[in-house]
Amino acid sequence: MQLIEGKLQLQGNERIAIVISRFNHIITDRLQEGAIDCFKRHGGNEKLLNLVLVPGAYELPLILDKLLESKKYDGVCVLGAIIRGGTPHFDYVSAEATKGIANTMLKYSMPVSFGVLTTDNIEQAIERAGSKAGNRGFEAMSTLIELLSLCQTLKG
């Protein structure tokens, strides 16, 4: 039996984009910091890293599609924060953003990591953006790095 897995180390020549929702920026700014920290710690070249800001989580799939279609990037880390409110808006936005991101990744067969928080309240979002529950932005970039390595290994 052969075990095939990715490594948590960049070569330094990977072109990466981080797409970030500005809505709930108090949370997404921290996710962005975590993702950039992970990128640097694991050998990323900051000259090859681009940050792309979008208005909200609903717009993430469209801009992800444009980035992957451009073929300028080896992978994309998608970050956002959708916090439940008093209306069904949360359910619609979180479902469509999630489906759109997954469908776009499969459409282009390119590494994409999902760092979009979907929380019931602001406290849960804060916990996942760098306090008690770690930083999901860091984790999303870590996932992307490993996925890039694994895809490269499987490519041959």
UniProtKB/Swiss-Prot annotation:
Reaction(s) catalysed by this chain's protein: (2S)-2-hydroxy-3-oxobutyl phosphate + 5-amino-6-(D-ribitylamino)uracil = 6,7-dimethyl-8-(1-D-ribityl)lumazine + phosphate + 2 H2O + H(+)
Keyword Transferase: yes
Residue positions binding 5-amino-6-(D-ribitylamino)uracil: F23, A57, Y58, E59, A81, I82, I83, F114
Organism encoding this protein: Helicobacter acinonychis (strain Sheeba)
Residues of the signal peptide: none
GO biological process, one term: riboflavin biosynthetic process
GO CC aspect terms: cytosol; riboflavin synthase complex
Name assigned to this protein: 6,7-dimethyl-8-ribityllumazine synthase
Active site positions, chain numbering: H89
GO molecular function, one term: 6,7-dimethyl-8-ribityllumazine synthase activity
Associated pathway: Cofactor biosynthesis; riboflavin biosynthesis; riboflavin from 2-hydroxy-3-oxobutyl phosphate and 5-amino-6-(D-ribitylamino)uracil: step 1/2
Any one Pfam family match given in the protein's UniProt record, by short name: DMRL_synthase
EC assignment: 2.5.1.78
UniProt function note: Catalyzes the formation of 6,7-dimethyl-8-ribityllumazine by condensation of 5-amino-6-(D-ribitylamino)uracil with 3,4-dihydroxy-2-butanone 4-phosphate. This is the penultimate step in the biosynthesis of riboflavin.
Family per record: Belongs to the DMRL synthase family.
Gene3D superfamilies: Lumazine/riboflavin synthase
Entry keyword set: Riboflavin biosynthesis, Transferase
InterPro entries (UniProt xref): LS (IPR034964), LS/RS (IPR002180), LS/RS_sf (IPR036467)
Binding site residues for (2S)-2-hydroxy-3-oxobutyl phosphate: G86, T87, R128
